[in-house]
A protein has these predicted regions:
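Terminal peptide-recognition signature
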Residues: 13, 27, 47, 80, ...
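Acidic, glycine-rich catalytic/binding loops that coordinate metals and/or anionic ligands
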Residues: 69, 75-81, 85-91, 95-172
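Short beta-strand micro-motifs in enzyme catalytic cores
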Residues: 11, 43-45, 97-99
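Residue-level recognition of short, solvent-exposed, well-ordered loop/turn junctions
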Residues: 16, 22, 72-78
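Short, flexible loop/turn elements at secondary-structure junctions
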Residues: 13-17, 36, 49-51, 62-64, ...
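Histidine-centered active-site/metal-ligand motif
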Residues: 8, 49, 62, 98-100
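Short, glycine/small-residue-enriched coil/turn segments at secondary-structure junctions
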Residues: 2-38
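Zn2+-dependent peptidoglycan hydrolase active-site motif and core
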Residues: 23-67
Length: 173
């Protein structure tokens, strides 16, 4: 069977179309393209950043087509500078308007076509190239839902507190 891509490698920010996108750090335009396929990125920009001796990239997907008309390869972008806008669903791959932000340590020569999702079986490989973008964004942990307990932890709790005379019906807890 063909395993579906279910692991998201970036962070999505659902905002209105035409919302300005600001650079979280100073950088240089490394690549851009219109990935104009259904359920793809649509207009995409990749910035290259250098912090001390560390080089990494940020990818911005689901932008407006106008964003690509106003940008050039090698263009310097200042910290906090607006450099793009979020696209409409008609131009961003058919998605509800939002910004896809992804941090990438090595583009693997994929540039603007770097994947934003991967198969669960490949999670370890792809997340080694894509650290958590919240380390850059800084949304407080309290803004995220609590992690669900693992199946093993759920089973252990049930075994501890539910009597053997009680039956439960499920394939997996």
């Amino acid at each position: 069977t063909d395993e579906r891509r279910t692991i998201h490698l970036g962070m999505d920010f659902f905002v209105e179309a035409n919302t300005p996108v600001h650079a979280p750090l100073a950088g240089v335009v490394h690549a851009f393209a219109d990935r104009a396929h259904a359920q793809d990125y649509g207009p995409t920009i990749v910035l290259r950043h250098e912090v001390d001796d560390l080089v990494f990239y940020t990818l911005y997907g689901h932008l407006s087509r106008e964003s690509l008309q106003e940008i050039e390869l090698g263009q310097s972008i200042k910290n906090g500078q607006p450099f793009a806008t979020v696209g409409t669903s008609a131009e961003n791959g058919g998605w509800h308007p939002h910004l896809h932000l992804q941090v990438i340590t090595d583009l693997l020569d994929l540039d603007d076509s770097f994947p934003g999702v991967c198969r669960a079986s490949q999670r370890e490989v792809w997340t080694s190239f894509c650290p958590d973008p919240n380390r850059l964004v800084g949304i407080p942990a309290t803004a995220f839902p609590e992690q669900r307990a693992s199946s093993d932890a759920t089973l252990a709790t049930r075994r501890k507190f539910v009597g053997r005379n009680v039956r439960t019906g499920y394939d997996r807890p």
